[in-house]
């Protein structure tokens, strides 16, 4: 999802503890997490790595763990061309001096260190996207401002790709020994309009293989929205390949360990009930290809009168299907510093709505039995 730029926050550095972790294993189409093959729930906290108060990070991560959630998705990117347009940033692509540097200051990579350390402390695992399709916190366009590419040409631009791989190498090597890593993610919602779908598929194939060469122990995911390709035009936008993504082709990439799906029916021109079909369509592909599939973003705006009912219906469909885990967009809490990095989709910890939609669902999905058929595939699906 696109997000709004962060607000004014306090700065304080923290170091991440480095601990070994065994190679991850899956029972397809589910994950092995905490040493057990199971279904579970997670959330999104894109802002966790951009908080400048350790107390804020600690409270949020503690409450996520207290909710019974296993995974949260945190932005591992923060690019800038000026060094002054973001209160926290990790990478400075200076278009004036023509230099690319990592921000090692207290408002730099130390903030991602703090998020990883808090996740380790509370037993939460992290999905870490390392690039944004959108302009929030930098994104692809900061690379293109530096190298003179376009959004469409970025995916095949040799110099831009080398710079991104250098950043990926830095992030993966920094955290690959952490027990908090669930998945390295190539990009948040990659799109390439007016491109053949093979452009993103080739990019994802090459980059995921590169990451596996750096760290064969951990999962790698694409971070796409799950766009499907169909000749049936009556199915509409989500099945039209118009964003340059072919979910099914990408699911076949051997160095991607699972598929990702996002879901915002109203914004895409559908109704809320349509979301149930979107879930089922992707769950069927999990069985077809023997790979876990994650509904890693879904939400309903707080102004929607029947929000709880809509979310609960989707969650029941998730439980009734073969979606490995789901992560609602997004977790909200009243942070000690007063920071408010949320949008209208946030579900706030401590409210009745949060109990009904988040905690109750986490408990329900954790009780779902892994099928005997899935268990028989135990040794065949593990990160490459």
Question: Language model features by range: what are they?
Answer:
Residues 368-384:
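Extracellular low-complexity, O-glycosylation-prone Ser/Thr/Pro/Gly-rich "stalks"
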Residues 7, 78, 267-268, 380-382:
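Intrinsically disordered, low-complexity segments enriched in polar/charged small residues
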Residues 295-298:
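Short acidic/histidine-rich active-site segments
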Residues 2, 364-368:
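Secondary-structure junction/capping motif
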Residues 16-22, 375-379:
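Short Lys/Arg-rich cationic patches that frequently serve as NLS/NoLS or arginine-rich RNA/DNA-binding motifs
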